[in-house]
Each structure stands twice: as structure tokens, then as C-alpha cells.
Amino acid sequence: MLFVAACGNGGGSLFNDSIDDYISNNYSLYDTISSTENSDEYARVYLAEDRDISAVSSELQDHEEPTEMSELREGKQVFIYDNQFVTLTESEDNSSDTMIEVAEEEFVRNNYSPGFFQGYLLASVLGNMFGNNWGSQRNQACAANPERCYGGYNSAGTYVGKNSIPTIRGASTVRGGGTGSGK
């Protein structure tokens, strides 16, 4: 397992946006993923066009050091900020783009497959956050109901929380149209 502990200030000054605000202000919202457990929980997926994972990783770390951070491996890197998980993956549509998934801790606890983090974060980090039995309990839940176990945005599978009609993507790329056009 590869693991790097980030040493930093754990958050910026009073004048810095939270990492969630920084991401939403600097990248395009691409899609949302609904929780299978609680309709108030969801993950947001952003698109960093023409920026590879290393560039986006540097931008995020320059804004705020994560409390935990994996190494970049096989087109994926995971950060933990306070109560949020940020996952960077290479876009399946364009290898020069990066997908940025932001999920609250509770969304991760209740929806993610433990295997999603295998090789990226130590089990002890997740155990400290979610309880020592989280991995085995989620594995059992995933075995019983695989469609209720989320494997990340670019994963194949039948997770029921994935929006069959994406909330953002699929919209026209043509902007404008004047008053009353609905854009």
C-alpha cells in the first residue's frame, strides 16, 4: 500500500475558501451522484479541462494541504480534507482532462466500496474515521447488494445512485441564445 501523510497547516487562513468552495469556483460542475442511504447526501463531480491529475493535484494542495493524501497511482489520487474526500481521476472521455469528485464523509461511509481505497489509503486511516469494522461491514453490505456499493465516478457498474440522466452533463455546449432562451 502506498500512503503519504500530508504535513501542512490543515486549512488556510480566514480569507481562504474551503476546498469545496475552491473546487466549485474553479472547475465546471459535471455531474452529481445521489446516496442510496440518504437523499440529502450526494457527491459532486467536476471537470478540469486540459489539466492532468498532477496539475490539479498541485492546484488543490497550493490552496489547502489535505490532512491525508495518497500517491498518484494508476490514474487516481485521493485526498482527505476535514470531512471531505476529494478523488482525482483521469477522464474516460479525454485523457488530458481530470475528473474531481467531492464527497462528504457520510456519503463515503454509507455508499463507497472499501475496495475503492485499496492501495490508496491505509485501512487504519479509514478505520479511525469510520470505525474499525467499517471495511468488513461495507464489504458484507456490498456482497449482499452490489448495486448499492459505489466504486467511484469512472467505475463501471450498476450503482443505483448514479443519475441515469446526468444533472449537468449532456447539456448543450452552445451558450447564449438571447433573452428567454433558457440558458
Regions found by a protein language model. Name each.
Residues 8-183:
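Low-complexity, glycine/proline/serine-enriched intrinsically disordered segments
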Residues 3-6:
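C-terminal motif of bacterial Sec signal peptides marking the signal peptidase cleavage site
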